[in-house]
């Protein structure tokens, strides 16, 4: 079945046939779906191909079906060129993966690199599944939450979407339990609520989904500062890189401050110990000089011959003798004894 195309912002279109042009000459454009890539049966979706490169022509191609390549003349506004492809009413043959290309007038067979792929899914074809939350739709901030999508239909895959999110999370259905097939979506600790829906699909038709489940509003009690991870992201995340850098910087500053304080304290201690040692050395030198003076009594042993009789007495140093000189004339003679000095006194 050929596509029914209505241009919303461009003039004219025609179906390309013949050889495929050369790709990758220009930078790739972007491809968006309005209002979204999940399209209910019989509804219409707008696929917009745009670029900041001034393309005169845009081509829309659905993978796997070469005959469904469409061409539109681009429209230019504020440095942006774009073309809007209207696809609808949506049927099973129109679902699939789309890419778009851009080209210029002087080289129409030299195309840009292809845009990133965009999957267009038709919904509303089968019975809707049920969606529930464990432990419940109202939880405390930080409490772990698991959403369960189940149905009596033997769907191979279940898809969970969150309102406002561009992509969905999918899980294979588990074994049949009590007449139902189920898939569990662990969301991790809750920090912020949201509205969720789930769909079922079969393995041989991945772009054809069931009706959506009834919306499930998950509410979080509290005033969390962070958003709840989307179902397409892991529930456990690392911290904010900026906060991590701040934490590392603070730790480094604290460590440097502690090291500086330790070095300053050690320097002051060494200086104080050096002053004490200098004082002790000076005291020791003073004490040693006093001990030397005390150990040298400067005593002299004399032998006096009085009236030709030898007597021995101890005479103090001259500074300690009486000031009145003796009447006798005394003659001294040194003896060779090193420890004591002997004097020979001759009688007149």
Curated annotation (Swiss-Prot):
Keywords: Cell membrane, Disulfide bond, Glycoprotein, Immunoglobulin domain, Membrane, Receptor, Repeat, Signal, Transmembrane, Transmembrane helix. It is found in: Cell membrane. GO terms for cellular component: plasma membrane. Disulfide bonds join 49-100, 149-198. The keyword Heme does not apply. The keyword NADP does not apply. Its main location: membrane. GO terms for biological process: immune response-regulating signaling pathway. It is a single-pass type I membrane protein. Residues 1-21 form the signal peptide. SMART domains: IG. Residues 42-107, 142-205 form the Ig-like C2-type domain. Pfam families: ig (PF00047). It comes from the Eukaryota. Residues 265-348 are cytoplasmic. Belongs to the immunoglobulin superfamily. Receptor on natural killer (NK) cells for HLA-Cw1, 3, 7, and 8 allotypes. Inhibits the activity of NK cells thus preventing cell lysis. This is Killer cell immunoglobulin-like receptor 2DL2. It comes from Homo sapiens.
């Amino acid at each position: 079945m050929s596509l029914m195309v209505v241009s919303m912002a461009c003039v004219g279109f025609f179906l390309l046939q013949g050889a495929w042009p050369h790709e990758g000459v220009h930078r790739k454009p972007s491809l968006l779906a309005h209002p979204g890539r999940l399209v209910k049966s019989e509804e219409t979706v707008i696929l917009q191909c745009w670029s900041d490169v001034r393309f005169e022509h845009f081509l829309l191609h659905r993978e796997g079906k070469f005959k469904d390549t469409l061409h539109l003349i681009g429209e230019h506004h504020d440095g942006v060129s774009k073309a809007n492809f209207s696809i609808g009413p949506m049927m099973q043959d129109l679902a699939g993966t789309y890419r778009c290309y851009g080209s210029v007038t002087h080289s129409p067979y030299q195309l840009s690199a292809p845009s990133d792929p965009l999957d267009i899914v038709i919904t509303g074809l089968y019975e809707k599944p049920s969606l529930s939350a464990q432990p419940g739709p109202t939880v405390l901030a930080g409490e772990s939450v698991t959403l369960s999508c189940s149905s009596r239909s033997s769907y191979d895959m279940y898809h969970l979407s969150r309102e406002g999110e561009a992509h969905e999370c999918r899980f294979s259905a588990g074994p049949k339990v009590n007449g139902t097939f189920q898939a569990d979506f662990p969301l991790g600790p809750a920090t912020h609520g949201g509205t969720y829906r789930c769909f079922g699909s079969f393995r041989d038709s991945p772009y054809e989904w069931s009706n959506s489940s009834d919306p499930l509003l998950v509410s979080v009690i509290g005033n969390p500062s962070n958003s709840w991870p989307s179902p397409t992201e892991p529930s456990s995340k690392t911290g904010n890189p900026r906060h991590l850098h701040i934490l590392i910087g603070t730790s480094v500053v604290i460590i440097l401050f502690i090291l500086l304080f330790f070095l300053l304290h050690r320097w002051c201690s060494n200086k104080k110990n050096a002053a004490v040692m200098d004082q002790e050395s000076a005291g020791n030198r003073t004490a040693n000089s006093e001990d030397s003076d005390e150990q040298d009594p400067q005593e002299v042993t004399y032998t006096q011959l009085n009236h030709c009789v030898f007597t021995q007495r101890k005479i103090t140093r001259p500074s300690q003798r009486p000031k009145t000189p003796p009447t006798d004339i005394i003659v001294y003679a040194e003896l060779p004894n090193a420890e004591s000095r002997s004097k020979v006194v001759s009688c007149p």
